[in-house]
Structure formats: structure tokens, C-alpha cells
Swiss-Prot record:
Organism encoding this protein: Mus musculus (Mouse)
Name of the protein described by the UniProt record: DNA-3-methyladenine glycosylase
Role, per record: Hydrolysis of the deoxyribose N-glycosidic bond to excise 3-methyladenine, and 7-methylguanine from the damaged DNA polymer formed by alkylation lesions.
Keyword Nucleus belongs to the record: yes
Biased composition (Low complexity): 1-14
Length: 333
């Protein structure tokens, strides 16, 4: 049908009539931007979401056709989730990204195991902390301590003692237990299988967000004058770990398997150079009888991020070694 507006006026800038052909409903593309030329369309014409627009230069037509074909091919190969994350800006936005976006996040079943087993299983896993501005901090766990519950004289739950302070130790596996020491430092624990049992996270190998960790540590230091903290000093201790990740009492009793500000991810498998895990006495345990020297602290041998190295435990007779998850070797005492 002829274009509306009558004949074009002569002279400079005159409008030329354009022939427009509407496609049948069955040939309409699903949405703008993924148009495909119907079989009855003229070569060299541009097809939009709803109609065919008149003749256009052949080189431009070919370029547009090639671009649309590449787009269509890529969209067919992507999952809906991949298409969402490939949209510019969405990958970094805290509103379009959540812990569920991390396929390696460890669920509640991971934490539902005895304290000693969980303490060993933690090694090599990655602790993630998301700050309010969307910044994510990551660190690989390299040192833990197991506390076995009421029978353990060094545990806060010894004798079955349950108070508002240690309630997190008696909640479901994966619950955070954060407590204050010396009136100014925090320690991060995770409840395990068994009432009153938990695992203390002692040290991390910083992986992501090191400068932010350094700033957080410096903001809480008594004196910021002098040398800057080295990378190995950022998370080499339970309280340093909490400072570097901005973890305080407000995290107490949160669910590590469900929380949107802190969670645990699978660590990378490094089977090419498996680590050796040492079992040694826990740190700072006094007046706990035989429990003082029980080898319930576990750390990756040779890691520069471990808080305290036990040379005696490392130099004992060659222990039996068995493979475990994440490519680590466990030293059996």
C-alpha cells in the first residue's frame, strides 16, 4: 500500500515514498532484536520485530544480518541464567547477584557432621563475606579448631552449660557462634553435629579483596602509624580474621548455609600438589586437664597464613596419610 502523506514535495530534502509490507502473524519474530528474515522478504531489506522496511544498502544489510545471526546463535547456546549474568552491569550489582548465584556454595548437609570431621573438612574451603556496598571478600580456610561439646572441658558448652551467649553452639549445624574476647575482639565459630559442639575458624589465606581487608584491619588497630600490614598478617588468627571480614556480634546465630552476607564455597581442587594437614594442640587452652593437649587443632602444613606452627607435631614420626576432599592429605595421629 502507498505510504501516507501523499506525494513528496519537490526540492531539497524532499521525502521519498517508502513501501511498507506487514508480515503475517505467523511470521512475526518473537521480539525486537532477534528478527529473522521471512522467506518472502526481499533480499537487502531490514526486518524489524513487526514489519519490513524498504530497501537499504547491501553492505549495511549484510552487517546487520551477520550481527543478528551471531546474537541468535549465542542466545541459543546460553541458559537463561547465563543470559542474565552476561547483561552489562548485572554481574556486579548486589541487586541481581546473590549467594544463590554461586553454584559452589556449600549447603546445610556439609555442616551436619561431627566437629572433628567438620574441622578437617573446612580446610581448603573458601569463606565469603559480602559487605553492604556489594564488595565481596574471600579467603581459603587454612586453620581450624574442634570443640566437642559437653564432654570437652575447653568448650564453652562444657558440662552441657547453655547460656544466651553460647546458644549458637546448640542450634542446627551451620549456625554461627560469635563471641567477644578481651572486651574488644571477636571469634567466629560454626556449630557442627552434636549439641554444644562447634568449629573455630582460626586463619584464612586471603584470596579476594585484600586491600579492603587491610583497610578494615587498619581501622581497628591501636596505631595506624608505621608499616602496612603484610598479606600474611591479614587473617592469621581468629580475631584478625573477624576484623578483616568485618564480622562482629551481629553475625551471632546466623545460618552460614542461608545468609546473604556470609557463606562458604567449595575450594579449588589442587590435587597436583596436595597439602598435608597437621593435628596439634589447641591454642590458649588452660585449666582443661587432659583436654589441654588433645590434638584438636588442624592446619595446612607449610601455609604462611597459619597463626601458630607446631614444630613438634610436624616433626613426629612419619604419620599415616590418607586422601580427603579438596585434594588435601590428612595427617592421622
Amino acid at each position: 500500500m502507498p505510504a501516507r502523506g501523499g506525494s513528496a514535495r519537490p526540492g531539497r530534502g524532499a521525502l521519498k515514498p517508502v513501501s511498507v509490507t506487514l508480515l503475517p502473524d505467523t511470521e512475526q519474530p518473537p521480539f525486537l532484536g532477534r528478527a529473522r528474515r521471512p522467506g518472502n522478504a526481499r533480499a537487502g531489506s531490514l526486518v524489524t520485530g513487526y514489519h519490513e522496511v524498504g530497501q537499504m544498502p547491501a553492505p549495511l544489510s549484510r552487517k546487520i544480518g551477520q550481527k543478528k545471526q551471531r546474537l541468535a546463535d549465542s542466545e541459543q547456546q546460553q541458559t537463561p541464567k547465563e543470559r542474565l549474568l552476561s547483561t552489562p552491569g548485572l554481574r556486579r550489582s548486589i541487586y541481581f547477584s546473590s549467594p544463590e548465584d554461586h553454584s559452589g556454595r556449600l549447603g546445610p548437609e556439609f555442616f551436619d557432621q561431627p566437629a572433628v570431621t567438620l574441622a578437617r573438612a573446612f580446610l581448603g574451603q573458601v569463606l565469603v563475606r559480602r559487605l553492604a556496598d556489594g564488595t565481596e571478600l574471600r579467603g581459603r580456610i587454612v586453620e581450624t579448631e574442634a570443640y566437642l561439646g559437653p564432654e570437652d572441658e575447653a568448650a564453652h558448652s562444657r558440662g552441657g552449660r547453655q547460656t544466651p551467649r553460647n546458644r549458637g553452639m546448640f542450634m542446627k549445624p551451620g549456625t554461627l557462634y560469635v563471641y567477644l574476647i578481651y572486651g574488644m575482639y571477636f571469634c567466629l565459630n560454626v556449630s557442627s553435629q552434636g549439641a554444644g559442639a562447634c568449629v573455630l575458624l582460626r586463619a584464612l589465606e586471603p584470596l579476594e579483596g585484600l586491600e579492603t581487608m587491610r583497610q578494615l584491619r587498619n581501622s581497628l588497630r591501636k596505631s595506624t602509624v608505621g608499616r602496612s600490614l603484610k598479606d600474611r598478617e591479614l587473617c592469621s588468627g581468629p580475631s584478625k580474621l573477624c576484623q578483616a571480614l568485618a564480622i562482629d556480634k551481629s553475625f551471632d546465630q546466623r545460618d552460614l548455609a542461608q545468609d546473604d552476607a556470609v557463606w562458604l564455597e567449595h575450594g579449588p581442587l589442587e590435587s597436583s600438589s596436595p597439602a598435608v594437614v597437621v593435628a596439634a594442640a589447641r591454642i590458649g587452652i588452660g585449666h582443661a586437664g587432659e583436654w589441654t593437649q588433645k590434638p584438636l587443632r588442624f592446619y595446612v602444613q607449610g601455609s604462611p597464613w597459619v597463626s601458630v606452627v607446631d614444630r613438634v607435631a610436624e616433626q613426629m614420626d612419619q604419620p599415616q596419610q590418607t586422601a580427603c576432599s579438596e585434594g588435601l592429605l590428612i595427617v592421622q595421629k
